[in-house]
Amino acid sequence: MTQFESSRATVHIVGAGLAGSEAAWQVAAQGVRVVLHEMRPHRMTAAHRTGGLAELVCSNSFRSDDASNNAVGLLHAEMRRLGSLVMRCADANQVPAGGALAVDRDGFSAAVTEALDNHPLIEIDRAEIDGLPPADWGNVIVATGPLTSTPLAAAIRALTDESALAFFDAIAPIVHRDSIDMSKAWFQSRYDKAGPGGSGADYINCPLSEAQYHAFVDALLEGEKVDFKDWETAPPYFDGCLPIEVMAERGRETLRYGPMKPVGLTNPHDPATKPYAVVQLRQDNKLGTLYNIVGFQTKLKHGAQTRIFRTIPGLEGAEFARLGGLHRNTFLNSPKLLDVRLRLRAEPRLRFAGQMTGCEGYVESAAIGLLGGLYAAADARSCTLEAPPQTTALGALLGHITGGHIETIDTGPRSFQPMNINFGLFPPLADPPTRKPDGTRLRGNEKTIAKKQAICARALSDLDRWIADALRPAAAA
């Protein structure tokens, strides 16, 4: 064994949250030694309250457990098929929550901690890594989450570039393309400008009359806002990331001269009438199934967002893949910085997992930890593991992180933002269902349900094939 191979034989994982804990379990399950580094309880974050591994800082819900109709439920099912520790401990500590999987947070964390503590191949090191991991660690997973300590975050930023990490991220709502009413909206770029990769008709535009605009501004000003957490109050807003309601507070016309300016656009449905304001939506993924509302980062509560944004002409029936938000977060510009196996292009011995990579949510973080663990174990054993198909929830989420987004057409801030798993990340069905088993035609919501069920069935079938064709041979090598 060469010195390089020896340095890869032990996997060092920094951070024992959901992603790091799951990664450690997956690595050890492949017969590879793990050192799991966790700074708590010696150094706490502003959000954590215990030294337990995989502590749930906010909600105790893992969201829907419906693997036939819901994207996160599908992700649950895929992770269970891959022996996920997080899912096993969640199932063992479930509390009643209707169709959702919610857990006793203390029991869940205790179960994860006990499982990792008792595994013969896992060593838990309760110490802070206050900079880049030592150079002689040849196989590292960094899974330090959105509250990464300042010294480590600074070291990562120095290794990449100044804009690689966002400490106060702006999240705009994302809408499913097929829920937008195109009898009111239209495709057009301002002045028909075709940017890199664009056609000159790259935005969906929703026009507002003067009365509609002022009613919208009033609703923003009156809408209920989310309070900042204590640990979120120090960082300033980044330029260009002001919440839309803050812009509205600065003057009734501010939005008309900002993200809602109507210039360079003509409504083909009513070309003689110039819109007073225009809301633009920009394609958010390569598949063209998701569009984000440009400039609409917000701290409005979710109920207020859906109510207010559905007053926009063309968005009355909008279905949201993600609602907006603005909060302290640490995440990489992963499509630029990471390769398809989650390795840092600038230093491939470092692999990233969890919320730092640009996934959002407990289950998504654990899922990327699972994949990171499988990749690190394969590296330790000098094997190559192919990525899961993008038709699976795991593959779709990985695709979003490592390249499934598209760059913004205009110059300005990068477009990559954290996201939950949702059906908009999956490739379309080659042959969408149109009829019921009895031969009658599917209509309305029936068609939507059948489509989701077909996507879920395809995903589980393709995952089983990937396990048999790629994962098992790699593990046996």
Swiss-Prot record:
Uppermost EC category: transferase
Protein origin, superkingdom: Bacteria
Transmembrane segments: none
Subcellular location: Cytoplasm
Residues bound to FAD: G15, A16, G17, L18, A19, G20
Pfam families for the chain: GIDA (PF01134)
Substrates-to-products reaction catalysed: uridine(54) in tRNA + (6R)-5,10-methylene-5,6,7,8-tetrahydrofolate + NADH + H(+) = 5-methyluridine(54) in tRNA + (6S)-5,6,7,8-tetrahydrofolate + NAD(+); uridine(54) in tRNA + (6R)-5,10-methylene-5,6,7,8-tetrahydrofolate + NADPH + H(+) = 5-methyluridine(54) in tRNA + (6S)-5,6,7,8-tetrahydrofolate + NADP(+)
HAMAP family cross-referenced by the UniProt entry: TrmFO
Identification of the protein by name: Methylenetetrahydrofolate--tRNA-(uracil-5-)-methyltransferase TrmFO
Organism field: Nitrobacter winogradskyi (strain ATCC 25391 / DSM 10237 / CIP 104748 / NCIMB 11846 / Nb-255)
